[in-house]
Amino acid sequence: MHFMKRKHPCRIRKRADFLAVRTGEKRRGPLFLLEVKSREQTAGIKSPLVARVGFTVTRKNGNAVKRNRIKRRLREAVRVGLTDDIEAGTDYVIVAHSDALHAPFTFLISELSRRIKPKTKHQKRQQGNMNGI
């Protein structure tokens, strides 16, 4: 039986691109911080409109083996669960927390898909009302 491979999204690899995304919107979650920035907002970068994803795992998450495992899990979660949800012309940087190493893979995918989708005005208003209580 032949299984169709899903295409990996483009990766962010340059420091300047990571720093540019840091100025964008931040969406916090229990397993990671997702930084999102539209490339139209980033001046001077001329590239085809494809979605790009970068991964950051800091040294406080453990030794190199643990950090690499977290990155592999996140890369696979993006490939399997999010290739249809990510917006073309947008850069995403996932800053992992140490909990991403031991979280169930299905939970990792569901958290990523929840954070990737932009909030509507109605959801933002509801969240604002909850913070005021």
From Swiss-Prot:
Q: What does this protein do?
A: RNaseP catalyzes the removal of the 5'-leader sequence from pre-tRNA to produce the mature 5'-terminus. It can also cleave other RNA substrates such as 4.5S RNA. The protein component plays an auxiliary but essential role in vivo by binding to the 5'-leader sequence and broadening the substrate specificity of the ribozyme.
- Name of this protein: Ribonuclease P protein component
KW Nucleotide-binding (keyword) present: no
- What gene name is listed for this protein? rnpA
EC annotation?
Answer: 3.1.26.5
From which domain of life does this come? Bacteria
The enzyme class is hydrolase
Spell out the family assignment given in the record's similarity comment: Belongs to the RnpA family.
Pfam families recorded? Ribonuclease_P
Enumerate the GO terms in the molecular function aspect: 3'-tRNA processing endoribonuclease activity; ribonuclease P activity; tRNA binding
What keywords were assigned to this record?
Answer: Endonuclease, Hydrolase, Nuclease, RNA-binding, tRNA processing
Species of origin reads Bartonella quintana (strain Toulouse) (Rochalimaea quintana)
Catalytic activity field: Endonucleolytic cleavage of RNA, removing 5'-extranucleotides from tRNA precursor
Q: Which GO terms describe its cellular component?
A: ribonuclease P complex
The processes (GO biological process) annotated in the record are: tRNA 5'-leader removal
